[in-house]
Structure formats: structure tokens, C-alpha cells
Amino acid sequence: MIEIRFHGRGGQGAV
């Protein structure tokens, strides 16, 4: 679950 780390960038936060 990476979305929990980048909370606020669209879910995944990888973008």
C-alpha cells in the first residue's frame, strides 16, 4: 500500500 505514504497525490502518489 503505497497510497498511504503519498496520501494526497491522487492515491498512489507515484505521479
From Swiss-Prot:
It catalyses: 2 oxidized [2Fe-2S]-[ferredoxin] + pyruvate + CoA = 2 reduced [2Fe-2S]-[ferredoxin] + acetyl-CoA + CO2 + H(+); 3-methyl-2-oxobutanoate + 2 oxidized [2Fe-2S]-[ferredoxin] + CoA = 2-methylpropanoyl-CoA + 2 reduced [2Fe-2S]-[ferredoxin] + CO2 + H(+). Keywords: Oxidoreductase. GO terms for molecular function: 3-methyl-2-oxobutanoate dehydrogenase (ferredoxin) activity; pyruvate synthase activity. It comes from the Archaea. Its EC number is 1.2.7.1, 1.2.7.7. Heterotetramer of one alpha, one beta, one delta and one gamma chain. This is Pyruvate/ketoisovalerate oxidoreductases common subunit gamma. The gene is porG.
